[in-house]
Curated annotation (Swiss-Prot):
Post-translational modification (record): Ubiquitinated by the CUL9-RBX1 complex. Ubiquitinated by MKRN3 at Lys-371 leading to proteasomal degradation.
Name under which the protein is recorded: DNA-(apurinic or apyrimidinic site) endonuclease 2
Sequence position, cross-link Glycyl lysine isopeptide (Lys-Gly) (interchain with G-Cter in ubiquitin): 371
Principal location class: nucleus
Gene: APEX2
Function: Functions as a weak apurinic/apyrimidinic (AP) endodeoxyribonuclease in the DNA base excision repair (BER) pathway of DNA lesions induced by oxidative and alkylating agents. Initiates repair of AP sites in DNA by catalyzing hydrolytic incision of the phosphodiester backbone immediately adjacent to the damage, generating a single-strand break with 5'-deoxyribose phosphate and 3'-hydroxyl ends. Also displays double-stranded DNA 3'-5' exonuclease, 3'-phosphodiesterase activities.
PROSITE patterns: AP_NUCLEASE_F1_1 (PS00726), AP_NUCLEASE_F1_4 (PS51435), ZF_GRF (PS51999)
Organism name: Bos taurus
Bias-annotated ranges (Polar residues): 382-410
Site note Interaction with DNA substrate, residues: 304
Gene3D superfamilies: Endonuclease/exonuclease/phosphatase
Oligomeric and partner information: Interacts with PCNA; this interaction is triggered by reactive oxygen species and increased by misincorporation of uracil in nuclear DNA.
Amino acid sequence: MLRLVSWNINGIRSPLQGVRCEEPSSCSAMAMGRILDKLDADIVCLQETKVTRDVLTEPLAIIEGYNSYFSFSRNRSGYSGVATFCKDSATPVAAEEGLSGLLSTQNGDVGCYGNMDDFTQEELRALDSEGRALLTQHKICTWEGKEKTLTLINVYCPHADPGKPERLTFKMRFYRLLQIRAEALLAAGSHVIILGDLNTAHRPIDHWDAVNMECFEEDPGRKWMDGLLSNLGCESGSHMGPFIDSYRCFQPKQKGAFTCWSTVSGARHLNYGSRLDYVLGDRTLVIDTFQSSFLLPEVMGSDHCPVGAVLSVSSVPAKQCPPLCTCFLPEFAGTQLKILRFLVHFKQDPVFKQSALQPSNQTQVHMRKNKARVRSTRSRPSKTGSSRGQKNLMSYFQPSSSGPQTSNLDLPSLGTLITPKTSEEDVMANVVEGQTKASEAKDEKEIRTSFWKSLLGGPSPMPLCGGHREPCVMRTVKKPGPNLGRHFYMCARPQGPPTDPSSRCNFFLWSRPS
């Protein structure tokens, strides 16, 4: 069996913060290893890693028993990015970053790019510059004993921001490039699985509020998925797309099967989300080898939950990892770089040909002068005439025998030192004086505290929502417009169906300007 899991992790370092370990240096490796063990998959595909190569650490990338592959955003730090972790028993024969082929600079690429004539070179580079696609190619053995090729496309598709129309164009062009590459691989004889965050809820059953959304099925992303996927799951339908939504193949009518929830509104508590994460397999592969397709909503740590599938095939591991594997990166390769690689050879100027070990005549003159000064300084007697040896403890209690006297006070010898006794009256006086000072300090502190309390009254209590009569929460308008930056109050409960009394009510109140 081959088990695949895909998860939009929303920052690969975020879920690691809750894992405790005694050795900080190995904490990341232990945490990442525990996450992979918890997912219990032969191949784990992660999206939205939010790391760039300069901040990727060895404990995070090199996990015992796995070989990993990363694609980074080249334009922004802490943005996008995908990664694939393969068990050593599922080592790929090839791996490649990006969909266009422009990022392939070494052997071991997957190949099969298809016809991309309607894309410019600049557009292809832009589509691959955000670290949104990673391909690994594997050898699998079917239950019949036949060896075949399987290509996994780990994708994090763009989100179309309503306020940025150009991002919708970018998203649709990315979809187009993804489909061209996937179909080219199919035409070359490889089985193909597209898995990851597609950032589109395909059917109304895949979105909690589809009935209230205008022109839901007219969305360009949903139309693209209509053309990519076959209708009616595994059964024959009016449209026979090259791929099948594996989850809907096994659970065609399952409601509430969501994979993404809003963290701001707390919608996950009431399962008020959408299904954006998929495992799409080519039609022949799904029908012949898929045993199950599942969601893992109980796995926390991100605003998405993992999804996956189980195939009735076995993996045939490659003898060596592809060149894209992180173990071959110079910073993780385990070989020390020579310092000569960082030095630039240049022709020496004749002025500097003199050896540094042989000083010039002028330098020798200065050195002789400095030596003479040192000798004269050392031979000069001390002003005090005292020796620099270790002093006797008694010398601190006796007057100095040489040098000017700084004081006429005769210090007693060590044996005659006597500690005076403190009378009971003095002790009581000190206690009373201390209590008086403490009382005065307390009174002064109380006066100061009351003054600041009168000056700074603190925040006023939150208003109560109309539906539950519970304290509200304050939010800030972030949408561009006349109300940008204004504060308002709303119900503090999580978002949910309007018919659910435990979900958020529609209370809204503008905050008074300060």
